[in-house]
């Protein structure tokens, strides 16, 4: 971006930013990015982005804890996930942005809220990167049963190599990311469809697996739907939330997608059947095919199934697919955090180096920063390889819930302003309106309570917020003045509804819907440097 002249050698933060040369006050968030994603890629990203380690690896331990009730839990969380995605879809049609819900939080609640939601989202994906790298390392060691070479590779070394290679691929171009995700998603989808086809065959023809006939009788013979009680079944909810992490990626890709108005609704509308088939359908089949006790903590339940039926070569092939799923999730996380950090950087909420975009349209610094945290996972895998996955999964789940809450809150505020005549809704609208948003937030609050009951990992994860919250407060007060200066350069506001740093200052708006409102039409308070809040 251009630099304002300043006679003082100590330039302020605002000197490095200029008022956007457009009526769109958020145009600066998109500078340097390329429209490198087409409908084919986005459709596949929407279908396959959230099919990752949560489903392929985490389901094994969840089945052990919750039993067959896990399928119902997947359906319930899938319903709320769909509501979240429809709300995000309406916000995207309102204004596409690579900053996704962080940019919408900035528009509707101001810079402080954007700072918190942005850094929590980054924490989510940074921890997901650790979980994915850990999962891949576990998957690779599985091949030790066939070749001692794989058994001898330290888990931390596999995680290190995975992080380095994935970061390097993400730094090339958005087009390469789109192609990688297209093929990753296609492999995952074909693998799940293959599993379901084989599983349905065994179910329909009653073919025994390890001497046990699959079907509903299998559930009855193994203590019913709640084999370990109701509370253990409910406590796994946060792990299932992690399995759905990534559905919001379609929002981050919107800023680099061609023909958004047509592509985004079509992509989001595929989600409901994706949830029904790939999540609820596959988990239901797992429950009907084998006893819940047959599944293991550190092994994909899909691999367990193919191992049990004894068809030579199917288990290793599925294990390779599972590695692909984890690599896809890691790839998507690096992509997403790079764009989110860029959006925060141009607003002053993240270090200025995160605004750097390469000639190929890649936010290099933001991706590298997340990659560095991914290397933290290497250390974690060195010291506590057995617990590494569960620890970071719980932390990432908290970040996912914070992201979903930010989307719901932004959407309900947007609809409130629509009701006041300050915005016009697109034709593609979220069902249920503001009621759906409040229902989502109530559900997320319940999940947090259940997470607190999951002693020790869940309890300690929530207790870690006692460290995260003070860090966020310190971070905000560290960057607040810079954020204020940059906001003033952008005409003193962060969105169509004027907000100085973190405080709405509008007394009066014109009655007809507008996409941009001139500062002259507004009555502003506190014209001096804002004190923040």
What are these regions (language model features)?
Residues 1-60, 64-69, 82, 86, ...:
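Membrane-interface "cap" regions at the ends of multi-pass membrane proteins
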Residues 33-37, 47, 57-158, 271-276, ...:
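Extracellular loop-to-transmembrane helix junctions
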Residues 37-56, 61, 162-165, 219-280, ...:
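Hydrophobic, membrane-embedded alpha-helices of multi-pass small-molecule transporters
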Residues 154-213, 268-272, 393-406, 436-439, ...:
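Membrane-interface loop-to-helix entry segments
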Residues 184, 353-364, 404-455, 491-494:
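C-terminal membrane-solvent junction of multi-pass transporters and transport-like membrane proteins
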Residues 195, 202-203, 391, 395-403, ...:
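A generic transmembrane alpha-helix motif of multi-pass inner-membrane proteins
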């Amino acid at each position: 971006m251009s630099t304002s002249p300043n006679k003082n050698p100590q330039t302020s933060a605002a000197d490095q930013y200029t008022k956007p040369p457009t009526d769109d006050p958020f145009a600066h968030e998109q500078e340097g990015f390329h429209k490198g994603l087409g409908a084919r890629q986005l459709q596949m990203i929407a279908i396959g982005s959230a099919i990752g380690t949560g489903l392929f690896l985490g389901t094994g331990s969840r089945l052990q804890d919750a039993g067959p009730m896990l399928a119902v839990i997947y359906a319930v969380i899938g319903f709320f996930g769909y509501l979240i995605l429809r709300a995000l879809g309406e916000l995207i049609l309102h204004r596409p942005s690579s900053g996704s819900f962080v940019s919408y939080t900035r528009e509707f609640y101001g810079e402080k809220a954007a700072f918190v939601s942005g850094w929590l989202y980054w924490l989510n994906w940074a921890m997901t990167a650790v979980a994915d790298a850990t999962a891949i390392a576990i998957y690779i060691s599985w091949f030790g049963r066939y070749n001692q070479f794989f058994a001898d590779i330290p888990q931390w070394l596999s995680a290190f190599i995975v992080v380095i290679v994935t970061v390097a691929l993400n730094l090339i171009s958005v087009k390469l990311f789109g192609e990688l995700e297209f093929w990753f998603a296609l492999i995952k989808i074909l693998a799940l469809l293959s599993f379901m086809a084989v599983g349905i065959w065994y179910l329909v023809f009653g073919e025994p697996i390890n001497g046990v006939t699959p079907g509903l009788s299998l559930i009855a013979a193994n203590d019913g739907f709640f084999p370990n009680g109701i509370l253990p079944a409910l406590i796994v909810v946060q792990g299932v939330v992690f399995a759905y992490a990534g559905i919001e990626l379609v929002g981050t890709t919107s800023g680099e997608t061609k023909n958004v108005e047509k592509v985004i609704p079509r992509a989001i509308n595929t989600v409901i059947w994706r949830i029904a088939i790939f999540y609820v359908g596959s988990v239901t089949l797992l429950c009907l095919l084998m006893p819940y006790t047959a599944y293991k903590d550190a092994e994909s339940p899909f691999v367990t199934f193919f191992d049990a039926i004894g068809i030579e070569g199917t288990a290793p092939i599925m294990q390779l697919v599972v590695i692909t799923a984890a690599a896809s999730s890691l790839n998507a996380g690096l992509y997403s955090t790079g764009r989110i950090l860029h959006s925060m950087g141009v607003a002053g909420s993240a270090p200025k180096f995160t605004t750097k975009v390469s000639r190929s349209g890649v936010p290099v610094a933001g991706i590298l920063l997340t990659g560095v945290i991914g290397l933290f996972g290497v250390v974690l895998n060195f010291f506590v390889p057995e617990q590494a996955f569960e620890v970071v999964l719980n932390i990432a789940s908290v970040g996912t819930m914070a992201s979903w809450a930010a989307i719901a809150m932004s959407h309900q505020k947007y609809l409130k302003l629509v009701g006041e005549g300050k915005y016009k809704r697109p034709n593609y609208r979220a069902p249920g309106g503001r009621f759906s948003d409040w229902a989502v937030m109530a559900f997320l609050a319940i999940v947090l309570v259940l997470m607190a009951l999951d002693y020790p990992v869940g309890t300690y994860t929530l207790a870690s917020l006692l460290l995260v919250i003070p860090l966020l407060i310190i971070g905000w007060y560290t960057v607040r003045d810079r954020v204020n200066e940059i906001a003033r350069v952008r005409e003193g506001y962060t969105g169509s509804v004027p907000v100085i740093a973190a405080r709405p200052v509008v007394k009066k708006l014109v009655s007809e819907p507008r996409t941009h409102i001139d500062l002259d039409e507004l009555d502003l308070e506190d014209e001096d440097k804002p004190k923040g809040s």
